Amino acid sequence: MKKKQLTAAIMTALMTMSASAYAAEQTTAMDSYELAPVDVAGQRTTETGTMTAETASLGALGGGNVLETPVNVISYTDETLKKSFVPTRGFLNAATNNPSVMVGGASTDNNVELQIRGIEFNTHDILLDGVPGMIMMQNQPTNYIGRMEIIAGPNAVVSGIGLQQSASGFVNFVPKKAEAKPNLDITTSYASSRYFSHGIDWGQRFGKNQEWGIRVNAETHNGHTTMSGEDLHGRDLYVNIDHEDAKSKSSFLYGYDTEVNHGMPEVLRIKDANWGTSVTRLPAANSVVKNFMPRWALLSHTHRVYLLQHEQKLGRHLTVYAKAGIMHRDWPGYITAKPFLQNDAGDYTLDISGSSTMG
């Protein structure tokens, strides 16, 4: 009886092992298989009111998707500029949306302490639709800008070599141009302490195939800023005329802006203070005035720009382009100075000089 039970137990164990081995073989065979090709068709919808754009201008590399470019680029739309606007800091507030860009605490668009990746960057380095030397150090109007492209890092291949080009990166202003759908926007805004601005943005395309387009942006502003004792008033006009067909693109941009700025804040200079004698430490924050400049300090400018460009397709994979521009600037009023720290109490001196041809 015991022999029969032992034989039955051995047979049961062998059958279980065989079944397990067979099941394992079957499982291994099912782990590897190949599906037939699957094609997925879809259409990307264009969103409106976005903060960033999908495309950017890349100089010699042409235009392209920002996700496919060999450089670090972020392309901000005019929505970013609108939502970042503060009097005298519109451009700076928008630029610092990029984590590679830093701005000094007392900077304004006129008095810039800008850095890209820790390296100093001047507003003279800003490109206008890929052309250097068209932007001056001033309170930058942003109402005519359709995209603001910021490239961080080496950029000579993309931007070319400007007279004062920074190795840290560059900023490119892309002007608005007429779109397929006509637009007319009239805006009035109030900000800070009695600071008013009024603007118009009109664009339309013409021709049998809408090959011609015109975009007009104009703005006037006047009032006090958030800085104590500072006020400014100015106006601007930018007109962009373009032509586009299957083989070519051409455009001509005219820009004019002028501004009078009284009491523009300056940064307190501590580097040249008499350290170790009259100055031994930084003064307490509450002992320093909010604005070192008097209300009658003056900084006024007039800025004109003319920009012509043409792009021609010579073949499926070959395109040539040419761009040329002229910029004229004038400072009819310049009465300002840098404040120098004198002692631990926060006293400072100003040696104001300059001239004015304004009436």
Where are the predicted features?
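Transmembrane beta-barrel wall of Gram-negative outer-membrane proteins
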Residues: 183-185, 190-287, 295-320, 324
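Extracytoplasmic loops and strand-loop junctions of Gram-negative outer membrane beta-barrel proteins
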Residues: 129, 154, 182-185, 220-224, ...
